[in-house]
């Protein structure tokens, strides 16, 4: 059985010391797990993510990453946890693609040919190797998002957190993000997807449902992605999930699986 790589215990978080954005949040993420954090806007998802790599420090409770207390050693934790933010403009700050993707590994001591290889291979993984000498400001939103992913992958973190990774992307962009996630899983990385869109979490091993700063439920997709629970917590119920529940079918493991199951049902019908 895989061991927890992230342990969150009784976490409380407040920006002003009075009003809590997170209240008594506790959960674990196992090594190599594809873990989803689901919640409506304002649930506290982004605040929780910032605690997981030490950008924010808990006033009450604690967060452990690979056994390291985030509050005591945030610098070490940031080497282990990479965050791809929802808006790449919040993450990218170097003039060129080459400089942006090379910045992290350079600061970790990678030099010369090794650095060139890391930059090229990270960009290749997101289909951006041909953009290596382009200026960041000349890129589209989707291209910037891919560079932001490459910049995190170049640092080879054990844990990669994607905050709303599918927002404002076309079908091709979403597929590319999924391909990256699948590659990371094959490499044994721990991947966390943070979103308000339930359909993107069908492939997760487990999902945490967060609302109003509190944990509502943690479990496998079939235990969390239940229409009445989603509605109760101000989340849209994807048509595909509603349909499977109405038909009395077990939730599919992916959107592709859902299409295959429904296609076979229609043929039988």
From Swiss-Prot:
Keywords assigned by UniProt, alphabetized: ATP-binding, Cell membrane, Membrane, Nucleotide-binding, Translocase, Transport
SUPFAM superfamilies from the UniProt entry: P-loop containing nucleoside triphosphate hydrolases
Gene3D superfamilies (alphabetical): P-loop containing nucleotide triphosphate hydrolases
Main location: membrane
Gene Ontology annotations for the cellular component aspect, listed alphabetically: ATP-binding cassette (ABC) transporter complex
InterPro entries: AAA+_ATPase, ABC_transporter-like_ATP-bd, ABC_transporter-like_CS, ABC_transpr_CbiO/EcfA_su, ECF_ABC_transporter_ATP-bd, P-loop_NTPase
Disulfide bonds: none
Name this protein carries in UniProt: Putative ABC transporter ATP-binding protein PF0528
Native source species: Pyrococcus furiosus (strain ATCC 43587 / DSM 3638 / JCM 8422 / Vc1)
């Amino acid at each position: 059985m895989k061991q927890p790589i992230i342990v969150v215990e009784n976490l409380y978080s407040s920006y002003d010391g009075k009003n809590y954005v997170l209240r008594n949040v506790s959960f674990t993420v196992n090594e190599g797990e594809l873990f989803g954090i689901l919640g409506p806007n304002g649930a506290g998802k982004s605040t929780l993510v910032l605690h997981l790599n030490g950008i924010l420090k808990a006033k009450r409770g604690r967060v452990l990453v690979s056994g390291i207390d985030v509050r005591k050693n945030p610098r070490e934790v940031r080497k282990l946890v990479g965050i791809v933010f929802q808006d790449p403009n919040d993450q990218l700050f170097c003039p060129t693609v080459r400089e942006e993707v090379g910045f992290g590994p350079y600061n970790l001591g990678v030099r010369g040919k090794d650095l060139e290889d890391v930059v090229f291979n990270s960009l290749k993984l997101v289909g951006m190797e041909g953009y290596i000498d382009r200026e960041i400001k000349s890129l589209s939103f989707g291209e910037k998002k891919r560079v932001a992913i490459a910049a995190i992958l170049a640092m080879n973190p054990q844990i990669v957190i994607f905050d709303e990774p599918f927002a404002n992307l076309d079908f091709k962009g979403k597929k590319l993000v999924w391909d990256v996630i699948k590659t990371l899983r094959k490499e044994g990385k721990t991947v966390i997807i943070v979103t308000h869109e339930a359909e993107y979490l069908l492939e997760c091993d487990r999902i945490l449902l967060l609302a109003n700063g509190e944990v509502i439920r943690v479990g496998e997709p079939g235990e969390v992605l239940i229409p009445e629970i989603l509605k109760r917590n101000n989340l849209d119920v994807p048509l595909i999930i509603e349909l499977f529940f109405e038909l009395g079918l077990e939730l599919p493991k992916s959107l592709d699986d859902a299409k295959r199951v429904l296609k076979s049902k229609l043929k039988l019908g």
